[in-house]
Amino acid sequence: MSLARTLFIVLPMVVAALAVLILVADRIHRRPIVGAGLVMCAIGFVPVWVMIPVEPNVPPATLACFLVIIALLPGFSWRLTSGDLMVATAWGLVGLSVAAGSPLNYVLSDLVFGALPAYLAGRLLVERLGLRRVAEVLAIVWIAVSVLVLLEAVTTINPFSYITVHNNLYEEWSPPLARGSLTRVEGAFGHPIALGVCLAAGIPLILATCWRPGYRIAAGALVLGATIPTFSRSAIACAVIAVILSLMQVHTNIPALWRMGFLTVLVGVGSVLLPYVLGVFDSAGREQEDSAGYRGDILVLVRQLNPLGLSSAYQKSGDSVAWGGYSSIDNHLLLTALRFGWIPVVLIMAGLLVYLARAFIQRSNPAQIALLSLIPAYGTVAFITQIGTVVWLIAGMAASAQVSVLLESRNNTTGGGVGVVAGHANPWNRIRSGDWSCRAFAGRSVRPVSGADAGSH
């Protein structure tokens, strides 16, 4: 085919695609809630193997994050927190690690097309919409994903596996996995662990929406239940921790009776399901033991870490990579340290410790609780498929919500330190003054009430 004919066919397609992208970006700029929905739907309903066949291969959720950045970055306030500076420092060290021998493709895949767009998207969306409105969008998508997952568990049919794209990612992630004699659910996430961990990350945000307590608890229970047929110990543990940590926080705003009832039902149902789940794990037998043993064996690679740059354990033969003889590193903290050095990892872990301290003194926001609930996963699974996008998206949401805490301190207000709405008047001030409406939680303007009405609260 001649060059002229190729251009005649390709150029109109490129122009049409650009026109669509511009229209979508403009829509997101005018209504940021559209951007939140686009990102959440790309995570929950588009498999990672569905991507444009052009190098570099960019996951669909990352493309959605880039669209949000293009649309909302011009209006960014540039109010930065200590968390932003810590993350930026860690990323800067990751960039410098290239000079210390780290391959550039690791920086591109993990940072440029991974952590960076997801973090910025979460940061921008929460600044424009407030944490609870973004949480509501996530909750709706996560509920839909959970329903599909439970249907998949009953029927053993995963409709997303029928979305055929002839590439290496489809061959790697579309085949179903089993534990013992049972097929594990995967949804659009390509792996049971990825599905379960991402669902668990959404539970604190679901419980922090402005819905009625019963609706929030039902949604949280549904998502928690959807992690069980993944038969992933890490995912189930993360989900349980997410529920417990969320119910311990005052910002959840769920009455004590509802909390106790939820925990009682959780313990009761858990005691019934636990023998069944343990039976599935026992039927896996050697597979489960080998998996746990392997995760312990790879810890010997800690001895070969460098402060900055590629580990001496790096081995490459053709297209295959190994680390000290281990071809797979099921530990994201360790894998990151092997690729870029242990200093960036220590910085991120220090940030998690700060979030943990804030949780103990009731000063954390729901996104921070979500990050804390995933602690069991950070050391037991790599950030495969959509996990990295979800973690860094929530990290950006947590940082943006924290901005409102700084505004409270600067303005000598008493907003409660939860960072519900960043960049706007904190609604907790209204709540403390007696306004318990959903509008206050969403950061919308509230019509002033008369003295008589105010006294009726």
Predicted regions and their residues:
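Transmembrane alpha-helical segments and their membrane-water interfaces
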Residues: 17-21, 67-77, 94-149, 351, ...
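Alpha-helical transmembrane segments of multi-pass inner-membrane proteins
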Residues: 136-162, 167, 172-230, 238-248
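N-terminal signal-anchor transmembrane segment
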Residues: 1-75, 96-98, 332, 374-378, ...
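Hydrophobic transmembrane alpha-helices and their immediate junctions
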Residues: 20-21, 244-245, 258, 339-375
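Transmembrane alpha-helices of multi-pass inner-membrane enzymes
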Residues: 67-71, 370-375, 384-435, 439
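Helix-loop-helix junctions and helix-breaking kinks within/between transmembrane helices
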Residues: 49-58, 100-112, 191-193, 217-248, ...
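Long extracytoplasmic/lumenal interhelical loops at the membrane interface
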Residues: 278-340, 355, 359, 363
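A membrane-periplasm/extracellular boundary helix in multi-pass inner-membrane enzymes
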Residues: 147, 152-157, 247-286
